[in-house]
């Protein structure tokens, strides 16, 4: 069952790849503007905890920032230090990787980061606990985006690998 009132437009979304110190400063300036909610995602070289983080992405409904956290650490640290509420799909995976990436005694702990993070995977289970094979939407990010955002949204993961 489609719920059109939940569908959000993605027209006008601007994605900023951080490729220079000026880009990193722009990302930090964006973080300082103050936001009600910031989505965060990590891309790793594997699915286990010891996989290396190759990209960190964060943003809102209009602006996204994508960066290699090994080259541009300051915006990622600023995100961790900010008090803005975060949202992530399968948040423990992303938050654990962020905490490991920013391993330093003065940085927020996993508990601190999780306390201000909403996990959309948990929300998806609350909305419909059924898996796709059982007649539900499923709980994967692509299936949820197709249902609630845009059924024609491209599979960016597939496109990145193509």
Residue ranges and their predicted role:
Residues 31, 47-49, 111:
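Sterically constrained small-residue positions within well-ordered secondary structures
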């Amino acid at each position: 069952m489609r719920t059109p009132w939940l569908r959000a437009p993605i027209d006008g979304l601007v994605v900023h790849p951080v490729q220079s110190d000026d880009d990193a400063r722009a990302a930090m300036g964006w973080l300082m503007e103050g936001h009600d909610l910031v989505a965060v995602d990590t891309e790793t070289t594997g699915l286990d905890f010891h996989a290396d983080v190759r990209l960190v992405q964060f943003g809102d409904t209009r602006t996204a920032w994508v960066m290699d956290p090994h080259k541009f650490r300051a915006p990622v640290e600023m995100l961790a230090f900010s008090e803005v509420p975060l949202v992530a799909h399968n948040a423990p995976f992303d938050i654990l990787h962020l905490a490991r990436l920013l391993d330093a005694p003065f940085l927020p702990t996993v508990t601190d980061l999780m306390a201000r993070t909403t996990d959309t995977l948990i929300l998806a289970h609350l909305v419909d606990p059924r898996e796709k094979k059982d007649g539900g939407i499923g709980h994967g990010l692509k299936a949820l985006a197709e249902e609630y955002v845009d059924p024609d949204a491209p599979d960016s993961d597939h496109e990145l690998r193509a």
